[in-house]
Amino acid sequence: VGIIPGMKKLAARPEQFRLAISLHAPTAERRLAIMPIEKKYDLKAVLEAAAAFRKRITFEYVMIGGKNDSDQDADALAALAHKHGALVNLLPLHPGGAPGLEPTPSNKVKNFAGRLQARGVEAVVRRSRGLDIKAACGQLAGQTGSGAAGR
């Protein structure tokens, strides 16, 4: 996400930290449509704060069907990742993880990763875990009624 005051505190510490930024879109305008926090901590300022970290940063990028998975998105993400020397973790949106949104099909995720790699960006497609028991990232928050959520 990029909470800038927290990033600055971590960067000032003597320990070395690996920073992962929840990016989810390659431009500020596209990111705002997905992540309202862009209003408070805009992408430019987040990336400026990230420059203080001495270790390689990672961009976390949840693939949302029709929202951030076009060839143009891949090209813009590749340029951004290349500029900042970032690793890109691609994560398919979990079914039911966000109302009204659909995951990018797996073949399109692979093609997106290939497009990044062809442009010199290290991109990794992360495997979803916990889907079989409806406990993947973003799924537990939506649980209501009987089940684990009330415990």
Q: What are the residue ranges of the model-derived segments?
A:
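Conserved AdoMet/S-adenosylmethionine-binding subsite of the radical SAM
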Residues: 1-124
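Radical SAM enzyme core and accessory elements
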Residues: 128-151
